[in-house]
Structures are given as C-alpha cells and as structure tokens.
C-alpha cells in the first residue's frame, strides 16, 4: 500500500524558518494495522512543479518521529538548500506483544530497521518495509 492510497491525518503544522513542518498519522498495513506517525518538513519553494530532494532521517534507539525534528537543528540549512526532510517513527507502537517493553533497548523504541521474520514480532515489527519501501514509494 502506498502513501497515496493511505489516509493521512494531519496532527499538527508549524512554520519553521521558510518552510512548514507537518506531523502526520496513518494506519500502516505493513505494521499490522498499527497507527504510525511521521514529521515532514517542506521548504516553501517546493511545489508540484518545483520538486526538491528529500532526506529521510532515521532516528536511533528510544527515539520517535519528534526527536530529530525537535533537537536536530536541521531546518535552517534545509530551508537554505531547499531540502525536504521526512522524520518517521522508527518503531511500531501499540503492538502489545508480551515482553516487548521489558528492556529499553529491545521492542518499542528500539529503532531496528529490519523486518522481523518470526512470530509474534513479524506481524508488527517491519520497520525496513516502512522506512525503506513504504514511505519512499512517494
């Protein structure tokens, strides 16, 4: 399923330097129907007729879609260079798999960019598909 086939909901929008930062939520089929979130920064010069490069910023351990957007200090340079930035959450949230939150460095918030191959993880833990295929398709 592509992003264009998904229902994106705008959670918030903020003007940042000469662009717009929008937080979206959507139901992700590759995460087993869980809600996923991402922040997208678009410089003001970007449009359908003026495409700009896109940087996908994959945050690390214990991060959400907000960490780099709030702390990365990237928007001034992205505005100047006319670069869009996508900040996806790098973990599925709400899978409620027994034991997934027993350790801070495994499970929710761990930020592994792989697809799980074993049950019960394989239904929801497909962050490679989300980060490298699902979001980049559009």
Each language-model region and where it sits:
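Eukaryotic N-terminal low-complexity, Ser/Thr- and Lys/Arg-rich leader segments
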Residues: 1-7
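N-terminal cap/lid segment of alpha/beta-hydrolase-fold proteins
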Residues: 8-45
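Short, conserved beta-strand segments within well-ordered enzyme catalytic domains
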Residues: 25, 39-41, 56-57, 85-87
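Secondary-structure boundary elements
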Residues: 47-48, 132
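Short substrate-entry loop that stabilizes the transition state in hydrolases
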Residues: 48, 52, 59-88, 93
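Cap/lid segment of the alpha/beta-hydrolase catalytic domain
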Residues: 87-129
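Conserved small/polar residues in nucleotide/adenosyl-binding loops
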Residues: 133-138
């Amino acid at each position: 399923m592509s992003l264009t086939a998904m229902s994106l909901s705008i959670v918030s929008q903020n003007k940042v330097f000469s662009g717009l930062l929008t937080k979206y939520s959507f139901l992700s089929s590759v995460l087993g129907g869980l809600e996923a979130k991402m922040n997208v920064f678009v410089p003001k010069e970007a449009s359908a007729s003026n495409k700009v490069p896109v940087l996908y910023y994959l945050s690390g351990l214990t991060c959400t879609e907000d960490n780099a957007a709030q702390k990365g200090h990237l928007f001034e340079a992205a505005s100047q260079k006319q670069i869009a930035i996508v900040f996806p959450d790098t973990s599925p949230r709400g899978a409620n798999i027994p034991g997934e939150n027993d350790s801070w460095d495994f499970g929710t918030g761990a930020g592994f960019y792989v697809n799980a191959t074993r049950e019960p993880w394989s239904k929801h833990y497909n962050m490679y598909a989300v980060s490298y295929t699902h979001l980049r398709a559009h």
